[in-house]
C-alpha cells in the first residue's frame, strides 16, 4: 500500500480551539413509544428510499447528535443504542440523540445505482425536516458522529451540509475513500462482508466521481466553516472485523492522511487521537463518544 507505512508513523493527539454556540432552550417532553433510557422508536418516512426508516430518538434539546453505525449496522435498532450505550452516555446533557438503523454497507451516501440507498438525502434533508416538524428540533446546527463507515459519513455530512451539521466525529472512519490506497479495500470489504458491488455507489473509482464525495478532497470546506472535528484512529488493526469489513488498515491510513490534509488547508478546530490505546470496535468507540460529549455539547447546545 504505497506510502501508507510513512503515514501510519504519524502519531499525534491534537486538541485545538473549540467554538461554543449560544445556549438553547430545552425542548418540552415528547410523547411516543418510550423504551429504555427514555428514547422513542420512530419510523421516519423517506421518499428518497421509498420506505420508513427506524430511528431511535431521545429528546433533550433543540439540537441533536446524529449517530451513524458501522458497516454491519443493525436492521432495527442502531448499534449505538445497544453496544455503544449512547443514550445513557448522552442523557441529561441538554441535547437530543438521533440514531437511525438499517444502513448496513451503505457508507450513508446516495448510491447512483441503488435507489434503496439514498442516505445522504435522508440524513441531510428528510430526517432533520421531519424532526423539526414532528418533534420541535431546530432545523440546523446539529452534530454527526459515526463509527467505521459512519465516520466517513459524519465528515462528509458536515463538509457538504455545514448549516445542518457543525460538528463531525469520526471513529475508525474510512475518510479518504477516493485514494487508490483505500478504494480497492472498501470495494473488497463491501463484497466480502456484505455481498455488495460497491461500484454501484459512485461508479468505478477510476471514473473519478469518488472524489466528489470525499471529505479528504474537500477538507478545506471543514476548515473554512470552522467545523469542530474529532477523529479517533488507534495504532492497531484489532477490533470488530465485521464492523470494519476486515479493512482496519485502510481506516488507519486514511485517518492519518486526512489529518495532514486538514492541517495543510488551514484547519485548526480539530481533535485527533492516534494513540496506542483502544481498538476498532465498540469497546473503544463507546468511551470515545463519552470523551467527546463535552465537545459536542459545546458545539451545538
Swiss-Prot record:
Residues 1-36 form the signal peptide. One of its GO terms (cellular component) is extracellular region. Homodimer. The gene is mpt51. It comes from Mycobacterium leprae (strain TN). Belongs to the mycobacterial A85 antigen family. It comes from the Bacteria. InterPro entries: AB_hydrolase_fold, Esterase-like, Mycobacterial_A85_antigen. GO terms for molecular function: acyltransferase activity, transferring groups other than amino-acyl groups. The lineage of its organism: Bacteria, Bacillati, Actinomycetota, Actinomycetes, Mycobacteriales. The keyword Transferase applies. Pfam families: Esterase. SUPFAM superfamilies: alpha/beta-Hydrolases (SSF53474). May have a role in host tissue attachment, whereby ligands may include the serum protein fibronectin and small sugars. Keywords: Acyltransferase, Secreted, Signal, Transferase. The keyword Iron does not apply. This is MPT51 antigen. It is found in: Secreted.
